Amino acid sequence: MSLNPNGYKLSERTGKLTAYDLMPTTVTAGPETREFLLKVIDVLLDFVKATNDRNEKVLDFHHPEDMKRLLDLDVPDRALPLQQLIEDCATTLKYQVKTGHPHFFNQLSNGLDLISMAGEWLTATANTNMFTYEIAPVFILMENVVLTKMREIIGWSGGDSILAPGGSISNLYAFLAARHKMFPNYKEHGSVGLPGTLVMFTSDQCHYSIKSCAAVCGLGTDHCIVVPSDEHGKMITSELERLILERKAKGDIPFFVNATAGTTVLGAFDDINTIADICQKYNCWMHIDAAWGGGLLMSRKHRHPRFTGVERADSVTWNPHKLMGALLQCSTIHFKEDGLLISCNQMSAEYLFMTDKQYDISYDTGDKVIQCGRHNDIFKLWLQWRAKGTEGFEQQQDRLMELVQYQLKRIREQSDRFHLILEPECVNVSFWYVPKRLRGVPHDAKKEVELGKICPIIKGRMMQKGTLMVGYQPDDRRPNFFRSIISSAAVNEADVDFMLDEIHRLGDDL
């Protein structure tokens, strides 16, 4: 059932009221407030139902200028009636991509976990900040419990962690802590007292946020040394050591190495143990960006060899809003050493972080972070963990990997139509669709160019039809190819078949 903006009617009286006629402005408006909110919930629940209906479109696509004409985006000078606000809610969701739809394979973060969603509703209702225990006591304690559990899963008995607004900021916290650990005076004196130029290392398949750290923190992207990867997308560790020695010979100071556990495009896992050996040899901080692949830490079947040696890292980024299915946003950064976060980022603002409070101020988290205020991202994860249990998360990871194997099987069974690019380590499946005119043509670089031209055409048709969303992109070895992501618990084998069949229907004539 598509959402009909005109299908959600408040009573005639309530519909004519404005927000000023509801609580808290009008304290006696309990019945009207309840009627309004229940109608909003009707809209939300219908969207949940539509999201899980395979007969519904994934999206109703319109080009930006056309979309502007369909929507009333004006922000008025005077308050609009409540009925209009209800229609605004329904209209917004009518044209929103259903990222929880079983035929949405487009992004790393997809799915609509209803327990996590319920947690986000409660979080919005509580509307509290996460910088001190005095205003968020329950949520601060939840955060401690969940993050301690995640560090134990990594393999650490102590340490410290924080929830950050996305994997990019989590990686930034790792960079800042690494620099502070090696040069604690940098916080006060900046680069003036450094004995040389700092350099960091990461693979050419890393998330762009690693280079962004170098830019944001004044290192400069020229000093973020890119290490080549092999044909599977893994960092070539011999090249890492060669480049470290090369920069040391120039007088530079290697201090930070990023290993990626689940690259964005190919889903590759760098060789953590070998990189840890190199970091130990040359006294470099080892960070693991497991924003994408971190969920597999919970699977005894798939944890090794992908994460063998993870406990040797100094810091780990892990995003539950990806493979674990928590709602956006839910990103964590973990440190082996306790006390680094507070030492690195503390500014001791006396209007927030007084030392003479009536409770243990070690529970105040605001001075650990550069943000001050933090959104409450913990409750939805805590509630989801309670609902699934650690065993449930493990089963979820195993099921996603099982579906990937099913997709590989179906691709191999249709080898005339599909060309698998490589065996995936994660839930990223990279492939080309081969239309009728190119079947039987020997596979070479020239054919790959033609296959690459087909991807954006099929994606365009896909979006116009609205039945499916699968991403595509090039990399440094290949022209455009499809990259499907199976990270939603809603997906089953029939959905994988639909994906491949629909790509064939949309592209066979090209």
Swiss-Prot record:
Single GO term (MF): glutamate decarboxylase activity
Alphabetized UniProt keyword annotations: Decarboxylase, Lyase, Neurotransmitter biosynthesis, Pyridoxal phosphate
Known partners and oligomeric status: Homodimer.
E.C. designation(s): 4.1.1.15
One GO biological process term: olfactory learning
Chain coiled-coil ranges: none
Function: Catalyzes the production of GABA.
Gene from which this protein is expressed: Gad1
Consequences of knocking out this gene: RNAi-mediated knockdown in 5-HT1B+ neurons leads to dis-inhibition of male aggressive behavior.
InterPro entries to which the protein is assigned, alphabetical: PyrdxlP-dep_de-COase, PyrdxlP-dep_Trfase, PyrdxlP-dep_Trfase_major, Pyridoxal-P_BS
UniProt-recorded name of the protein: Glutamate decarboxylase
Residues that hold substrate according to the record: 107-109, 483
Residues annotated with N6-(pyridoxal phosphate)lysine modification: 322
Gene3D superfamilies, alphabetized: 3.90.1150.170, Type I PLP-dependent aspartate aminotransferase-like (Major domain)
